[in-house]
Amino acid sequence: MRIVFDIGGSVLVPEKPDVDFITKLGYELTKISEDHEIAIVVGGGKVAREYIEVASKFNTNETFKDYLGIQITRANAMLLIAALKERAYPQVVSDFWEAWKAIQLKKIPVMGGTHPGHTTDAVSALLAEFLSADLLVVITNVDGVYTEDPKKNPNAKKIPKMKAKDLVDIVSREAGKAGVSTVIDPLAAKIIMRSGIKTYVIGKEDALKLFDVIKGNHNGTIIEP
C-alpha cells in the first residue's frame, strides 16, 4: 500500500518535544515502510499557535503568520526525520513532486506546511490525492471524529465509521463556532471527499500500533468515500 500519515504537531510536541513518543513512533513508521510506501506530513501544534499569537501583538498580517506557522511545522518535521534516521529523505520536503521522487528513491518523505492558507491537514489530503495513496492516517490529540468538539461538550459521541460527506458537514458546522478547533479542517475534509481516499482518524495511543491501524483495527474513526 501507499500510505500518507498526517501527524499533529501537538502529538509530537505537546509542551516540549516528547522524546519517548517520537522515538517509538519513528520505529513504528520505519517498520511500516519496509512493506509499504509511506509519506508523512507534520503539523505545528501548540508551539505554532503560541508563536502566531505573539506575532499578532505586532499587528502582522495573516499571510505573515501563516509563514511563521509553516516554519514551526518544518522544525517539527526535522525532529521526525532525525528519529527515522537513514530511512528518511534527509531534508524536509517542500512540494509534492519532491515527495514522489523521494518515494522512488525508497526514502520516506517528511513535509511540514507548504503555502499560506493551507493547514497541514489540507497538505496531507492533497499529498494523498497527488500520490494516489490507498490510505490517509490522521494522528491527532483527539481519538477520532466526534459529533461535537469533545473538549467543549462532554456528551459528544465518537463516530466509529462515517462517510466523507458527513465529515464535511460536521467539521464545517464546528468550524463556524468561535474558539473551536476541528479534528480535521474543512478544506482537508472536502479534499478527502473529492479524492475518495479511505481515511483513519486516530489518537496518540493507537499511533504506536500502526500495523494494526493500517488493517483497520483501532479505536478511532474510519472515513469511507
Curated annotation (Swiss-Prot):
Listed GO biological process terms: 'de novo' CTP biosynthetic process; UDP biosynthetic process
One Gene Ontology MF term: ATP binding
Keyword entries, A-Z: ATP-binding, Cytoplasm, Kinase, Nucleotide-binding, Pyrimidine biosynthesis, Transferase
Subcellular location: Cytoplasm
Catalytic reaction(s) noted: UMP + ATP = UDP + ADP
Pathway: Pyrimidine metabolism; CTP biosynthesis via de novo pathway; UDP from UMP (UMPK route): step 1/1
Activity control, per UniProt: Inhibited by UTP.
InterPro entries: AceGlu_kinase-like_sf, Asp/Glu/Uridylate_kinase, Uridylate_kinase, Uridylate_kinase_arch/spir
Main location: cytoplasm
Ligand binding (ATP): G9, S10, G45, R49, T140, N141, Y146, D149
Lineage: superkingdom: Archaea
Disulfide-bonded cysteines: none
Enzyme Commission (EC) number: 2.7.4.22
Membership in a protein family: Belongs to the UMP kinase family.
Description of how the protein assembles with itself and partners: Homohexamer.
Function: Catalyzes the reversible phosphorylation of UMP to UDP.
PANTHER family: URIDYLATE KINASE (PTHR42833), URIDYLATE KINASE PUMPKIN, CHLOROPLASTIC (PTHR42833:SF4)
Listed HAMAP family: PyrH_A (MF_01220_A)
Protein known as: Uridylate kinase
